[in-house]
């Protein structure tokens, strides 16, 4: 059994995705989230958008909902010091261990989507799918 990658390697992998830049559109993330069973559809979400004040607004909403007894997830970007700041559950940052686990799980799922094996006349052939997530798409999938 191969050794699990370290937090440092997981973060390095995430930042390596920045080479794919920003790609407009939702097709890739929708396709990928569908392969995960559309986890976003099982959540009640508040999407905060705009130019200024998103972080403060989200922190306020998070605080109010936690005090009201809700389980609250918060996904923000960018982070200030550590990547872990981007994903919080009930005010607590995601752990290094959980980041490593999620990066590996999503990498494997992408690999499965890219190289599905198809049985054609008793010959196994790899079938390539173009599913390369950007940094933002990958980290969004982690949050779900």
Indicate where each model-derived feature is located.
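ATP-dependent carboxylate-amine ligase catalytic core
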Residues: 26, 30-41, 67-144
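Short functional linear segments
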Residues: 1-50, 57-59, 63-68, 75
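Generic hydrophobic secondary-structure packing signal
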Residues: 6, 54, 136-139
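Short active-site-proximal "capping" loops at secondary-structure junctions
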Residues: 52-54, 79-80
């Amino acid at each position: 059994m191969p050794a699990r990658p370290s937090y440092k390697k997981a973060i390095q992998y995430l930042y390596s995705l920045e080479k794919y830049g920003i790609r407009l559109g939702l097709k890739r993330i929708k396709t990928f989230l569908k392969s995960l069973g559309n986890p976003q559809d099982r959540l009640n979400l508040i999407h905060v958008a705009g130019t200024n004040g998103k972080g403060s607004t989200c922190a306020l909403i998070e605080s109010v909902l936690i005090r009201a007894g809700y389980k609250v997830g918060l996904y923000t970007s960018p982070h200030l010091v550590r990547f872990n700041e981007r994903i919080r559950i009930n005010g607590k940052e995601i752990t290094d261990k959980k980041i490593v686990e999620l990066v590996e799980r999503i990498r494997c799922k992408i690999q499965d989507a890219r190289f599905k094996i198809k049985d054609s006349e008793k010959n196994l052939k790899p079938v390539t799918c173009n599913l390369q997530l950007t940094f933002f798409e990958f980290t969004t999938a982690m949050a779900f």
